[in-house]
Curated annotation (Swiss-Prot):
One of its GO terms (cellular component) is plasma membrane. It is found in: Cell membrane. Its EC number is 3.2.1.39. This is Glucan endo-1,3-beta-glucosidase 3. Disulfide bonds join C361-C424. GO terms for molecular function: glucan endo-1,3-beta-D-glucosidase activity. A lipid is attached at S470 (GPI-anchor amidated serine). SUPFAM superfamilies: (Trans)glycosidases (SSF51445). It comes from Arabidopsis thaliana. Residues 471-501 form a propeptide. It is a lipid-anchor; GPI-anchor.
Amino acid sequence: MAALLLLFLFLFASSALSQDSLIGVNIGTEVTNMPSPTQVVALLKSQNINRVRLYDADRSMLLAFAHTGVQVIISVPNDQLLGISQSNATAANWVTRNVAAYYPATNITTIAVGSEVLTSLTNAASVLVSALKYIQAALVTANLDRQIKVSTPHSSTIILDSFPPSQAFFNKTWDPVIVPLLKFLQSTGSPLLLNVYPYFDYVQSNGVIPLDYALFQPLQANKEAVDANTLLHYTNVFDAIVDAAYFAMSYLNFTNIPIVVTESGWPSKGGPSEHDATVENANTYNSNLIQHVINKTGTPKHPGTAVTTYIYELYNEDTRPGPVSEKNWGLFYTNGTPVYTLRLAGAGAILANDTTNQTFCIAKEKVDRKMLQAALDWACGPGKVDCSALMQGESCYEPDDVVAHSTYAFNAYYQKMGKASGSCDFKGVATVTTTDPSRGTCVFPGSAKSNQTLGNNTSALAPSANSTTSGCIPKYYHHPHASFGDLTLLSLLLIIALVFL
């Protein structure tokens, strides 16, 4: 019976992961206070996001994703494209340093070579396919070509006459690049990567495209757009653009190349002339898009064929140049607070970013370590926090450093005090966050995971307010000079206490 139960749970979890992995997020870094890679990963895990796209191959970020199972798209930045395209050795070195050094611990699935090269870096268009081929050859040499795909993201503006979709075609100016590119994608089994922004199509249409049509809002049957050639009905701009890409490939006799949408989103704030960049519209678009993708609705041309889609983007990038809207595409602020709460009823756990009622207290990283240690000692002593989880061999002992241990103790005190104002300060060395700091089997007080692991046994979280015991002895929480004898005696006392409880 136990074996059957475990099998059921495994199959259930696998099914949920498969469903949720259709949605990913882009992680831009043009941010004033960019969270650390470990904080980024913690936020992604709390939101059940299993796919990400990076705009480079940052070492610290790739290390943070190790052993998480998150599927990662890494990128060759545009400024490295020329060098990659001119030398097989340069491409091989890039793959060695940025792929082989991390795979398979970090689940790199795709290498995006450049970004919107045909429309934003036109002078490099002629070398794009060469760069793709050199990277592919390097993967073959490293025996990684079956696990990792190579492609390049395009702006949807390379497609002309996108409505009706059946008449769409690629800008013929780029035929010398597009045709060999599609041949490469077909021969390697790689997807066409496409950036799809109904927001820009709507704004540039000057009122021709209805807002509801851009936002996936329900339309009356007589208001749906109909392709007169195929009689296919289109209820949203997103599907029309994706199908336009399918038809454009068909026009060139490529019919079996899948499409992955590498960017799509809606800005939540704009300048005086950007009237439709609002929180309500951003929430509506992204909520409806995620529902649409997760439900595997597909497109009118390919119904039931899910289009893996990456939301643009995880954080607001406040240092990006351009209009106000360019700085406000994020789902979250850098402190982990959601910009808005997505409406995802029935869409599962992914991006369930209503974290407004789930707050935690963590230690600040760039503060005096002696002040942290003093605050930790107070929390585990006079503060009456149960710090037993920080003992050597227990679930929260690793990493054995004062920041990690202080975070656990500070948060336990904060939760015990009912998140009262002032209970997360500790003389300036602590701060409140909405990102769950739990990791692996180390489940923090206040985490939604604590209900799964502890049930109703809240005694493990913190001692009673009436307790006369300290809950811990300061010296066995990040104290490198505690002796083996001290630890053994304390462990023995704990065992005796547990026996007689």
